[in-house]
C-alpha cells in the first residue's frame, strides 16, 4: 500500500503490475474502472459494465483529485486499487443520487494507455513515431494488448494528415504503413486473423511493395485453414520481391558510379552471413560478399531468375526432403512434403532470420555473445575447427 498524500487521504495498491512508461501530467489517458463505496462495498459506477473505456485529460478538472494523483503513478496495463477520503473524492456534498456526502471511496482502475494532443503536422509525426516505439517495447515484453493500444494511438495521429509539406506527407505515409504492419502482428498474436488480414491489406493500399504485409496476410489465412488464399499471397509477395530486385538493379546501373559507393562496412553481421542467407542451400562457409557492382548486378539477376522459376512450379508438386535430425548426426532422413508447404515455411522463416534478431539487439545497445543466434550446424562446425 502506497500513500500518495501526506495525510493518508489517498492510497494506492498495485493489483497487477504494468509495463513501460507512465503518463505525463497533462496527457490524455484511457482507463477501465470499477467504483465502490468503501463502507458498504456497493458498486456505484463501472466503465467495464458499460464496456466502454473512460477517456479524459489529466489536470483538466474532469475527475476527482484522487485520480489526478494516482493515475500519473501508473504504468500501462497496471491495475490498481485506489482508496480515498471524501476530501479527495466527492467532498461534503457527495454525488447526487449516487455517492453519499463525505463518503470514502474505493476504485479498481486499469490504465489502458495515454497520449499527447499534437498541434502541428511535424508534432503529429513525432508523436506517432513515439507511440510506435512505445508499442515496439511493449510487444517485446509480450504485452500485446497494450502494444496494440499504443500502435492504434500512433496511427490516429497521422491517418488523416494531409495539410502538410510533401516531405512530411511522405514521412507520414511510410510511418503509417509501418504501424499498420505492427498492428497486424499484434492481431496475429491475439489470433484475430480477420483483423490481421484487414489491417495488412490497408498497409498494401498505401504501399504495395511491403513484402512483409503479403507474408502476414498469408500467415493469417494459413491459421484460418484457407491454404489456397495463403499461398496466393505468398506468391504475390514473391512477385513483389522480383520487382524490388529490379529496383536494386536500376540503382546499380543508374545511381552508383564506382565500387566504393557499393561497399559498406557493417558492424552488425559479417558479409559471409549475408551471402549464406542468399544461397542457403549451398551451405558453403566463409563466402566473400560481392564488392563489384556489375558482378552484384549479375548475382541479383540470378536471384530474380530463381524466384521466377520457382513461381512457375505448381503448389501441389510433391517434394522429398532429405535432412538431418540433429546437427551432430550426419544420417540423412527423407520426408514427404509439397512445394507449396515448403514455400510457405521458407517465406515465413525468411522474415525472422536470426541475423535480424542479432541486429536489433546490437542496435539497442544490448550485449550479445558471439554465438548468439548461430544455427546448431554452425556451432558444430566451429567446434570441429
Curated annotation (Swiss-Prot):
Task: Name a GO molecular-function annotation.
Answer: peptidyl-prolyl cis-trans isomerase activity
Q: What's the catalysed reaction?
A: [protein]-peptidylproline (omega=180) = [protein]-peptidylproline (omega=0)
Q: Which domain of life is it from?
A: Eukaryota
Name the Pfam families for this protein: FKBP_C (PF00254), TPR_8 (PF13181)
Residue ranges occupied by any PPIase FKBP-type domain in the UniProt entry: 26-115
Q: What activates or inhibits this protein?
A: Inhibited by both FK506 and rapamycin.
Q: Which UniProt keywords apply?
A: Isomerase, Repeat, Rotamase, TPR repeat
What name has this protein been given in UniProt? Answer: FK506-binding protein 5
Amino acid at each position: 500500500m502506497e500513500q500518495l498524500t501526506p495525510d493518508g487521504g489517498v492510497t494506492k495498491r498495485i493489483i497487477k503490475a504494468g509495463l513501460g512508461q507512465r503518463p505525463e501530467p497533462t496527457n490524455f489517458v484511457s482507463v477501465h474502472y470499477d467504483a465502490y463505496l468503501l463502507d458498504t462495498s456497493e458498486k456505484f459506477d463501472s466503465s467495464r459494465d458499460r464496456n466502454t473505456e473512460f477517456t479524459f485529460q489529466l489536470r483538466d478538472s474532469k475527475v476527482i483529485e484522487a485520480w489526478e494523483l494516482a493515475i500519473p503513478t501508473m504504468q500501462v496495463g497496471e491495475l490498481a486499487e485506489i482508496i480515498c477520503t471524501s476530501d479527495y473524492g466527492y467532498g461534503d456534498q457527495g454525488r447526487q443520487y449516487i455517492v453519499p456526502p463525505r463518503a470514502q471511496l474505493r476504485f479498481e482502475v486499469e490504465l489502458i494507455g495515454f497520449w499527447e494532443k499534437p498541434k502541428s503536422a511535424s508534432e503529429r509525426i513525432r508523436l506517432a513515431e513515439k507511440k510506435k516505439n512505445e508499442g515496439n517495447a511493449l510487444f517485446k515484453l509480450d504485452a500485446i494488448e497494450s502494444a496494440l493500444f499504443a500502435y492504434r494511438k500512433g496511427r490516429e495521429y497521422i491517418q488523416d494528415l494531409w495539410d502538410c509539406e510533401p516531405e512530411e506527407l511522405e514521412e507520414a505515409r511510410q510511418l503509417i504503413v509501418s504501424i499498420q504492419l505492427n498492428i497486424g502482428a499484434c492481431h496475429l498474436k491475439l489470433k484475430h486473423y480477420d483483423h490481421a488480414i484487414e489491417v495488412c491489406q490497408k498497409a498494401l493500399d498505401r504501399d504495395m511493395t511491403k513484402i512483409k504485409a503479403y507474408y502476414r496476410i498469408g500467415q493469417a489465412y494459413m491459421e484460418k485453414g484457407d491454404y489456397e488464399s495463403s499461398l496466393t499471397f505468398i506468391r504475390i509477395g514473391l512477385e513483389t520481391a522480383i520487382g524490388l530486385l529490379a529496383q536494386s538493379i536500376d540503382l546499380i546501373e543508374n545511381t552508383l558510379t564506382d565500387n566504393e559507393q557499393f561497399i559498406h562496412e557493417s558492424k552488425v553481421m559479417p558479409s559471409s552471413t549475408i551471402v549464406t542467407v542468399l544461397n542457403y542451400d549451398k551451405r558453403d562457409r566463409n563466402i566473400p560478399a560481392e564488392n563489384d557492382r556489375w558482378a552484384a548486378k549479375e548475382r541479383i539477376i540470378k536471384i530474380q531468375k530463381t524466384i521466377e522459376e520457382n513461381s512457375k512450379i505448381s503448389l501441389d508438386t510433391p517434394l522429398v526432403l532429405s535432412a538431418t535430425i540433429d546437427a551432430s548426426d550426419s544420417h540423412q532422413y527423407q520426408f514427404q512434403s509439397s512445394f507449396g508447404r515448403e514455400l510457405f515455411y521458407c517465406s515465413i522463416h525468411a522474415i525472422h532470420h536470426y541475423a535480424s534478431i542479432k541486429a536489433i539487439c546490437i542496435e539497442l545497445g544490448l550485449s550479445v555473445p558471439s554465438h548468439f543466434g548461430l544455427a546448431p550446424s554452425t556451432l558444430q562446425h566451429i567446434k570441429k575447427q
